[in-house]
Structure formats: structure tokens, C-alpha cells
Amino acid sequence: MEALKKIAGVTAAQYVTDGMTIGLGTGSTAYYFVEEIGRRVKQEGLQVVGVTTSSVTSKQAEGLGIPLKSIDDIDSIDLTVDGADEVDKDFNGIKGGGAALLMEKIVATPTKEYIWVVDASKMVEHLGAFKLPVEVVQYGADRLFRVFEKAGYKPSFRMKGDSRLVTDMQNYIIDLDLGCIKDPVAFGHLLDGTVGVVEHGLFNGMVDKVIVASKDGVTVLEAPKAS
């Protein structure tokens, strides 16, 4: 499995060329993309500027010598490569297993070409078997938890050891065990309109390419362009 993740990450790095501003994703597959960019910067003299999606990725990129800028200092990003926890046939996805969903979505938004790198196990018929992360402000989080519970979403607070995980943005994450999300777009809108929810892990209609690594090789899936 780790070998497949590496193949997907390295394949995505081939889309990066000199002079690009690139979004550097978070997670076990995006890790290999960042490593390959670091190698190319060092060995090939690749000239890029990175924008990171988490403190973990910032630390990795700095260690590799990749020049970085804040999201606040750029207007657009040429290419962002990130992982995904699930991807359905309509190119909707669940992200946030690494607790970086808010920063990931902020970086994805001004991106001209958004690529996900996954192994074949992440491709699903319907989203929802992977718990949907919902980032919430700390104030009122327990009340919101009860609202989700009453709605039948089977919520659980993301934990780190014995205490609630706190994201880079100082929020909590409530994971929803939904089983199957029949209409990801409608459910995304529902969460968008829920007071106290900062962001959720449904990335609907955002991705341009999905690079899928399997034992049979690498497949690049292109999302249909919006008319």
C-alpha cells in the first residue's frame, strides 16, 4: 500500500514545472509528492514556491528546502496536490483524515488545477463509509454534538490521546459515521448552513484530476469540465 501511495505522489510531481506556485497537501500520500518536489528542488534546481495546508506539511517542506509563502501573500495557485480519504464516481470526495480539512479547502479554492493522489482502495461507489470530518468552533461544540446525535449522524469527537484533538486553527473535529451519503452536495450545503460549523470534509466538484495507483499501474482520471 505504501508503495502505491509513493507512485501516486511521484506521478503528480511530474505536473510541476519551473515558476509555479504549488499547494502542498497533507497526509500519507501527499507526503510523497512533497518529498519528490523537495528532491527536484535540490537535485534539479526546480524553481517553485509552496503554500502548505498544515503545520505538519510546513515542517516537512522547510526541512526539504522548498521555498514557502503564506496563503495571504498569493492571489492564485497554479497546482495543488493533495490526498483524499474517499472519492466517488462523480469526483466528489471526503478529506480530513489528517485533521487539515479547513486549510486544505482554503488552499484548494484559488487553485487553477487541483489534483488528488490516492491508492485504488479510496475509489468508492458512494461516499460515507469513511467518517465525515466536521470542523467546529470550540464554543458550543457539545451542543452541536447533541444536534448531530439527534439527527442520527453518529458523531464522535476526534481525539488525541485522552483529550479532544485541536486543529491548527484551534477548532475541534466531530466525525460523522454516516455509512452512505446519498447526496453529498445537498449534505454539504446543510453543513455549510449550520452555525458553529467552520468547515466540513466534503470536497464536492472541486478536483480536476485524480491520480489512482493500483497493483496494475497508475491511472489518471479527469473530472468533466463544467460547461
UniProtKB/Swiss-Prot annotation:
> Per UniProt, which keywords does this protein have?
Isomerase
Q: Name one Pfam family in it.
A: Rib_5-P_isom_A
Catalytic reaction annotation: aldehydo-D-ribose 5-phosphate = D-ribulose 5-phosphate
Q: Which residues are named in the active-site annotation?
A: 104
The record's Gene Ontology biological-process terms are: pentose-phosphate shunt, non-oxidative branch
Coiled-coil parts of chain: none
Q: Does the keyword Nucleotide-binding apply?
A: no
| Keyword Cell inner membrane assigned | no
GO molecular function terms here? ribose-5-phosphate isomerase activity
Residues given in the record as substrate binding sites: 26-29, 82-85, 95-98, 122
What PANTHER family does UniProt report for this protein, alphabetically? RIBOSE-5-PHOSPHATE ISOMERASE 3, CHLOROPLASTIC-RELATED (PTHR43748:SF3)
Subunit info here reads: Homodimer.
According to UniProt, the name of this protein is Ribose-5-phosphate isomerase A
In its UniProt entry, the species of origin is given as: Streptococcus pyogenes serotype M2 (strain MGAS10270)
> What gene is this protein a product of?
rpiA
